[in-house]
Amino acid sequence: MISGNNTTGISPRQLFLTHLAQTSDFPLALEVERAEGVYLHGPNGERWMDLISGIGVSNVGHRHPRVVEAIKQQLDSYLHLMVYGEYVQSPQVQLAEALAETLAAFETPDGLKLDNVYFTNSGTEAIEGAMKLAKRFTGRTELISCFNAYHGASQGALSLAGAEFFRQNFRPLLPDIRHIRHGKMEELEKITRRTAAVVIEVIQGEAGVRVPTAKYLH
């Protein structure tokens, strides 16, 4: 099969396996031609229900009409401008306001309001930013995460990972990282005045969908 500018006669699947770095030993290698709603469609009439949903990105379904329309409207205005907040961009400002409104009822123990947003490109970047912010704001260095947690693949985020499987090939990692058991009330005593931040999944995913009590999170 020849697709796009491929004139070698090699199938897209083989090109995928040859030229794209694989993130798992056994990739699904499904050739997706298009996606609609909850389904992925292959080039030969195949149809698969997508239970991954872009790891949450496509939870409203693929090519949702409102999402497609919003993207088209933005394309007609401008694409990438600046990531450091130098320009006033209406969609970005509106999203920041909406996020801040969801946190209006919360404040830090010092009485600070959570009304400011820093946008990142990925969850890993968000974790890295949170680690840096916590250290800078508190002046402390200790970070606490949970065993079997997964927070990203960069050096800092990987240091928070609670499974040796993810960390073993990349040591030495960041110092002053401690791990506690997810959902265990007695483990919270390990959070001290040396702790800059506790990084936690509300529901652990990589560990097997572990749901803690509301009391534990509070």
Where are these regions (language model features)?
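Catalytic PLP-binding core of fold-type I/II PLP enzymes
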Residues: 210-218
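Acidic surface patches and DE-rich sequence motifs
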Residues: 42
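Active-site-adjacent loop/helix segments that line or gate small-molecule/cofactor pockets in enzymes
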Residues: 1-39, 92
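PLP-dependent aspartate aminotransferase-fold enzymes
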Residues: 98-200, 204-206
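Short, small-residue-enriched loops and turns at beta-alpha junctions
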Residues: 57-59, 88, 186-187, 205-210
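A secondary-structure boundary/capping signal
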Residues: 36, 51-53, 146-147
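Glycine-rich phosphate-binding segment of PLP-dependent enzymes
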Residues: 48, 54-86, 94-118
